[in-house]
C-alpha cells in the first residue's frame, strides 16, 4: 500500500522550536496554585523511536533501511540510499533527515556500538537533567518486574508512547507532565495518560517506582534488572552484576556556620 506522508518545508527545519518558549494569556490571581494550568508549556525531547513497524523502512524503495533483530535499532544504509526522501515522507515523527550536501538521508543510529557493549546511548548519558534511561523492553506477555523498563511501561504504566494512533509501535516512552490539560495529553499519549499521571503523583508512596525513577542517569551502563535495597536502589547488568547503587532520598548534610578546625566562618553563596 502507498504510505501517506508529507515532506517538511525548509522553514520547518530553519525554525524547529519557534514559539515553543512562548506562553502568553490572561491568568487570574492565584491560578498558578491549581493544576492543570490555564497557560502552560513543556519541552518534549524527540529522537528516533526505532519503531517496531518503522514507517521509514516501509517507505524506502531502495530497501536501505533495516531493523536489527538483536536490539531493535533501526539503521539506514547510506550506500544504498539514492536520496528519494520517501523515508522522510513516510516517517510521521519526521526523524529521518535528508542531507542536502551528501544527497542521502541520515538518522539516529541508536548508538548501536555502545549498546553492543552494554552501555546506554549518548543522549541518555549526557542528559544533565537525568530524565532518560535506556534499556530493553520485554513483550507484554513476558513482563519482568525486575526490569526497570518493564516496570515503568508494562507494570505501572507511567511511561507512554508518543502518538500511538500512528500504529507503528514507537519504542521511546514518555512520562507525561502533570500540569498540562488531560485533553491535550490524551491526543499525544493515548487514553492511559490520566492513570499515568495519577500513578506518578503517588510516587512518594511507592518505593519501587521511586527506585526505578532514581536509576535515571545513575550509570552509563544498561540496567537490565533492579531492586530496592533499604533506602537505596540497585541496578544490575545482563549478568546480574551490580553496576549502580543510588540512595532513593538524596542525603542532606548540614554544615556548621563556624569551622572550628580552620577557624573560619562558612558563607553560602547562591
Regions found by a protein language model. Name each.
Residues 1-270:
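Non-ligating segments of multi-cofactor redox enzymes
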Amino acid at each position: 500500500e502507498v504510505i501517506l506522508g508529507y515532506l517538511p518545508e525548509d522553514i520547518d527545519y530553519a525554525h524547529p522550536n519557534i514559539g515553543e518558549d512562548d506562553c502568553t494569556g490572561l491568568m487570574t490571581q492565584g491560578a498558578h496554585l491549581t493544576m492543570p494550568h490555564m497557560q502552560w508549556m513543556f519541552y518534549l525531547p524527540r529522537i528516533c523511536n526505532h519503531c517496531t513497524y518503522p514507517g521509514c523502512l516501509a517507505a524506502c524503495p531502495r530497501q536501505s533501511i533495516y531493523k536489527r533483530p538483536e536490539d531493535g535499532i533501526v539503521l539506514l544504509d547510506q550506500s544504498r540510499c539514492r536520496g528519494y526522501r520517501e523515508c522522510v515522507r513516510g516517517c510521521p515523527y519526521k526523524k529521518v533527515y535528508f542531507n542536502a550536501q551528501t544527497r542521502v538521508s541520515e538518522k539516529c543510529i541508536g548508538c548501536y556500538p555502545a549498546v553492543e557493549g552494554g552501555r546506554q546511548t549518548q543522549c541518555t548519558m549526557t542528559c544533565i537533567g537525568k530524565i532518560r534511561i535506556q534499556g530493553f523492553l520485554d513483550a507484554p506477555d513476558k513482563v519482568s518486574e525486575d526490569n526497570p523498563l518493564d516496570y515503568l511501561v508494562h507494570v505501572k504504566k507511567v511511561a507512554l508512547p508518543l502518538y500511538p494512533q500512528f500504529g507503528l509501535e514507537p519504542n521511546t516512552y514518555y512520562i507525561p507532565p502533570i500540569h498540562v490539560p488531560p485533553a491535550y495529553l490524551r491526543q499525544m499519549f493515548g487514553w492511559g495518560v490520566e492513570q499515568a499521571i495519577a500513578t506518578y503523583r503517588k510516587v512518594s508512596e511507592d518505593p519501587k517506582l521511586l527506585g526505578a525513577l532514581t536509576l535515571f542517569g545513575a550509570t552509563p551502563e544498561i540496567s537490565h534488572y533492579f531492586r530496592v535495597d533499604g533506602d537505596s536502589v540497585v541496578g544490575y547488568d545482563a549478568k546480574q552484576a551490580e553496576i549502580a547503587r543510588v540512595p532513593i532520598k538524596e542525603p542532606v548534610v548540614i554544615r556548621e556556620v563556624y569551622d572550628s578546625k580552620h577557624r573560619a566562618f562558612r558563607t553560602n553563596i547562591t
